[in-house]
């Protein structure tokens, strides 16, 4: 048995087409164009690539994209003032602060400064709390994208044993809440979990977001399980690999996401989806 691939690039492209269609319909109806403001502090190469992709995505679907590229020595006060201005700007539906930030800046305070109805990354405690209370509003983009990928398989998630490897605020913790909402029985683990192999081996569904290449071995995977690999790690030879050993997981899994081309494109597409949702549901 070889796993079926969950093609994140194709699913994300379809989602972008749907969003672009809706933006065009809004224009025909005389409604305003959704707007996304993206703040980049410093010149981290990976962040610059991510931000350029997000701006390109905005152009593709017809959003208005506002770019704020700030020097690495930007102060906390200056960033706070910018966020406050964007919070009050009626043309802006979403404010995205690209992480990581330079060490002298307090990311938590800045993320909390973004108004919850413009927090299209879904990182604000208000939005995380809504998800925890089973009344999600703006959902964290990567877990939201993963749920869309899982829906594409047609597999009924209700009652499945799900294991999340990684407990970050951005992926692991909100992912566990999304899976609970879908009716899974969820175990949250991390790279220091005792008998990680045992936990993974019992799972019908595994979501790995630990940021450690090759952490989850293919032979750990339960035959037929769904494997979602959030990891994206660049090797010395330049090749991108996930947190799962793909080659040995492929013959055991029922479904699997590739790296690259799996989760990453969906994270970006869900940022657009959240921005459209904010425009139509929270701001119109």
Curated annotation (Swiss-Prot):
Record-level Gene Ontology MF annotations: methenyltetrahydrofolate cyclohydrolase activity; methylenetetrahydrofolate dehydrogenase (NADP+) activity
Pathway given in the UniProt record: One-carbon metabolism; tetrahydrofolate interconversion
Function: Catalyzes the oxidation of 5,10-methylenetetrahydrofolate to 5,10-methenyltetrahydrofolate and then the hydrolysis of 5,10-methenyltetrahydrofolate to 10-formyltetrahydrofolate.
Keywords of this entry: Amino-acid biosynthesis, Histidine biosynthesis, Hydrolase, Methionine biosynthesis, Multifunctional enzyme, NADP, One-carbon metabolism, Oxidoreductase, Purine biosynthesis
GO biological process, one term: tetrahydrofolate interconversion
Protein name: Bifunctional protein FolD 1
Organism: Pseudomonas syringae pv. syringae (strain B728a)
HAMAP family assigned to the protein according to its UniProt record, in alphabetical order: THF_DHG_CYH
Binding site for NADP(+): 166-168, 232
């Amino acid at each position: 048995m070889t796993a079926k691939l969950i093609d994140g690039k194709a699913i994300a492209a379809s989602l972008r087409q749907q969003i672009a269609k809706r933006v065009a319909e809004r224009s025909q109806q005389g409604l305003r164009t959704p707007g996304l403001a993206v703040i980049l502090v410093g010149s981290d190469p990976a962040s610059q690539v991510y931000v350029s992709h997000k701006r390109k995505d905005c152009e593709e679907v017809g959003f208005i994209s506002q770019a704020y590229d700030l020097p690495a020595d930007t102060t906390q006060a200056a960033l706070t003032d910018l966020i406050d201005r964007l919070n009050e700007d009626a043309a802006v539906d979403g404010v995205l602060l690209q992480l990581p930030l330079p060490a002298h800046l307090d990311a938590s305070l800045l993320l909390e400064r973004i108004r919850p109805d413009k927090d299209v990354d879904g990182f604000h405690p208000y939005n995380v709390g809504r998800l925890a209370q089973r009344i999600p509003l703006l959902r964290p983009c990567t877990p939201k994208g993963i749920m869309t990928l899982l829906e594409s398989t047609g597999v009924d998630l209700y009652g499945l044993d799900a294991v999340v490897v990684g407990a970050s605020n951005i992926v692991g913790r909100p992912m566990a809440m999304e899976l609970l909402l879908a009716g899974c029985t969820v175990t949250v683990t991390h790279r220091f979990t005792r008998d990680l192999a045992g936990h993974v081996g019992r799972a019908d569904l595994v979501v790995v977001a630990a940021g450690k290449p090759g952490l989850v071995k293919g032979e750990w995977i339960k035959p037929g399980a769904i494997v979602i690999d959030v990891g994206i790690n660049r090797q010395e030879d330049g090749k991108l690999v996930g947190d799962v050993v793909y080659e040995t997981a492929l013959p055991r899994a029922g479904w699997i996401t590739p790296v690259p081309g799996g989760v990453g494109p969906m994270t970006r597409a869900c940022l657009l989806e959240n921005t459209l949702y904010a425009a139509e549901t929270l701001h119109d």
